[in-house]
Structure formats: C-alpha cells, structure tokens
Amino acid sequence: MEQRLKSERLKTELITNVSHDIKTPLTSIVNYVDLLQREHTPEQEREYLAVLDRQAHKLKKLTVDLVEMSKASTGNIPCHIARRSVRELIDQTVGEYAEKLSAARLEPVVTLPDEELYCLCDGALMWRVLDNLLSNACKYACAGTRLYIAARREGETVAFSFKNISRDALNIGPDELMERFVRGDSSRTTEGSGLGLNIAKSLVELQKGTFSIAIDGDLFKVGFALPRTE
C-alpha cells in the first residue's frame, strides 16, 4: 500500500513538474510572438528573436531528454559493449567541457592510476553518462570550487566518482534526488530538465554497471562502477 501511494505521488509530481517545464518556455514564446506582431524597432526584433531561439532550444532539449529517459528506463537503446580506455573516456569528455567548466568557474581535478585502466562499456552511452554528470556539475556546483573526477580499479570493476560542492543547500535525500524531474534547487530556477541523473543511472545499468549518489552536507558525490577488463 505504501509503495503504491509513493508511486502515485511520483506520478503526480512528474506531471506537475513536466507541465511547469513545458509551460514556462511556451508562455515566453507566445508572449514574444505577440510582441513581434506589434510595432517594434530592429533592435527589439533581434532581442525578441534571441529569446524565442533560446526558449525553443529549451523545449527541444526537454523533448530529447524525455525521449532518452523513456528509452533508457525501458532498456530500449542499442548497447554495443567493447573494451574502452578509461583515461581516454574521461580526458575526451573533460576536454570537450573545458569552456563550460570555465564559464561555471569550476576547476576539474582528475585523478587516475598510473597504469592503464580499461572498462567494458558502450562508447556512445558512456559519453552520455559523463555528459550528463558534467552538465549537472556546471548547473549546480558552487562557482569557484573544484570538481573532483576519479577512476580506480576496484575488484573486477572500474569505480568512477564525481565530487563537487553544491551551490544550493541539499535538503533532500539521495533517493529523492535521483527521481525524475527533481533538481538540487527546489525553486526550479536553474535551467535543465532534472532528468540528467536519472538518465545517467539508467544508462550505466544498461551497461551492466551500478550507480549511486551520496550527500554529506553540501558535498555531492556520484559513484558508478562498470565491469573491468585487461
């Protein structure tokens, strides 16, 4: 009975949150289209079009995340497991995020063992996992701090960890934070769908891995493990 009530509560919250995330950019689009239909200067037109473009991209990103969440949670995504270099996976992703990390005033600190580590994963899905975790850090980590990224050998697995100081107080448990559309900022003022962690967890599990979140005060940590190979 308790589980069913929780499930119903989550469904209600999901509908409420996705409605909010769709309504906000849609309202903005409608308002700015109305402004464009009135008399305006060329400078105002450029400003209005920039807002429309930004809000349209928000809706597109939300739609893409919703589709990916649905596919990931049902396992309806092709998964091609192969031997991958952990160093290459992390270095490539951090390199591609250099500008965003700089803009968020986050200093990435990567710790890897001297010896080469290899894991069994799907390269494209692993990119999406790392992409979601770095994107999450850029949105919610405290500016002017470090983002600690590490990987190490742990038995028959490679254990990955991402640690950062949260910008907002984390008055929420790890399980609740993992739920769909839940964000670290309860005001929902930060851009993003709130689906990133849920998608990352589903994609890791699709690759026969495990995924967890730990919160200690303002310290936020994501850990996941994938099968190791030589």
Where are these regions (language model features)?
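Short beta-strand/loop element within the Bergerat-fold HATPase_c
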Residues: G144-E156
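Conserved glycine-rich
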Residues: K208-G209
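Short helix-loop "hinge" at the ATP-lid/N-box region of the Bergerat-fold HATPase_c
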Residues: A137-C138
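Short conserved segment of the HATPase_c
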Residues: A169-V182
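Short alpha-helical segment of the dimerization/phosphotransfer core of two-component systems
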Residues: V51-L59
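Conserved micro-motifs of the catalytic ATP-binding
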Residues: H40, T74-C79, Y118-C121
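Conserved catalytic submotifs in the C-terminal HATPase_c
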Residues: H80-R84, E107-L117
